[in-house]
């Protein structure tokens, strides 16, 4: 249930993103403006499955998952701005530049992701992203995401097993 037009709760996030446990990394959207920016939360819990091995005795939220959380935030912004995915359409991470990690994120942290549209061209959208904990920057990156229907070819069994016929 939405309390205002700029906040999204988990039910609405689940309606927009295909990700599910343990890979859904956005817990709530705090604010957004279509076509401009989005601010979201990831509550980092010791119960996350990757903390068993990253690292035993010194749990650290993996940097690649900070980037994934920001990428999921771009997906929510894109879907709220341009509409949901159509059947067969995909939204995927297409590139990353200038990723910088400033400090570790640990269990108990509440990570705020802020993403902004930079530009869109030929099916690719460029975003900037910043992740913060307690107002302190933990990660910055420029990300590219793509939205498209993958090319598919349908070949029947008879076409595959048909003997080559040479014309004379």
Curated annotation (Swiss-Prot):
Keyword S-adenosyl-L-methionine: no
UniProt keyword list: Cytoplasm, Lipid A biosynthesis, Lipid biosynthesis, Lipid metabolism, Lyase
EC number(s) on file: 4.2.1.59
Catalytic activity: a (3R)-hydroxyacyl-[ACP] = a (2E)-enoyl-[ACP] + H2O
Places the protein is found: Cytoplasm
A biological process term (GO) from this entry: lipid A biosynthetic process
Keyword Transmembrane helix: no
Active site location: 54
Origin: domain of life: Bacteria
Top-level EC class as recorded in UniProt: lyase
Gene Ontology terms: cellular component: cytoplasm; membrane
Main localization, broad class: cytoplasm
A GO molecular-function descriptor: (3R)-hydroxyacyl-[acyl-carrier-protein] dehydratase activity
InterPro entries documented for this protein: FabA_FabZ (IPR013114), FabZ (IPR010084), HotDog_dom_sf (IPR029069)
Function: Involved in unsaturated fatty acids biosynthesis. Catalyzes the dehydration of short chain beta-hydroxyacyl-ACPs and long chain saturated and unsaturated beta-hydroxyacyl-ACPs.
Family: Belongs to the thioester dehydratase family. FabZ subfamily.
PANTHER family found in the cross-reference section: 3-HYDROXYACYL-[ACYL-CARRIER-PROTEIN] DEHYDRATASE
Name listed for the protein in its UniProt record: 3-hydroxyacyl-[acyl-carrier-protein] dehydratase FabZ
Taxon lineage: Bacteria, Pseudomonadati, Pseudomonadota, Gammaproteobacteria, Enterobacterales
């Amino acid at each position: 249930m939405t309390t205002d037009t700029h906040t999204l709760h988990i039910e609405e996030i689940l309606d927009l993103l295909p990700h599910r446990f343990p890979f859904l990394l956005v817990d709530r959207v705090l604010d957004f403006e279509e076509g401009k920016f989005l601010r979201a939360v990831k509550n980092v819990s010791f119960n996350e499955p990757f903390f068993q091995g990253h690292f035993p005795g010194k749990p650290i939220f993996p940097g690649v998952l900070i980037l994934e959380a920001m990428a999921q935030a771009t997906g929510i912004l894109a879907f709220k701005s341009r509409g949901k995915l159509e059947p067969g359409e995909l939204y995927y991470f297409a590139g990353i530049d200038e990723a910088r990690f400033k400090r570790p994120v640990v269990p108990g942290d509440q990570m705020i992701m802020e993403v902004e549209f930079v530009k869109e061209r030929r099916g690719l959208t460029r975003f900037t992203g910043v992740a913060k904990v307690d107002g302190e920057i933990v990660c910055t990156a420029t990300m590219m995401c793509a939205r498209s229907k993958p090319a598919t070819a349908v070949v029947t069994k008879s076409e595959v097993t048909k003997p080559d016929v040479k014309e004379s």
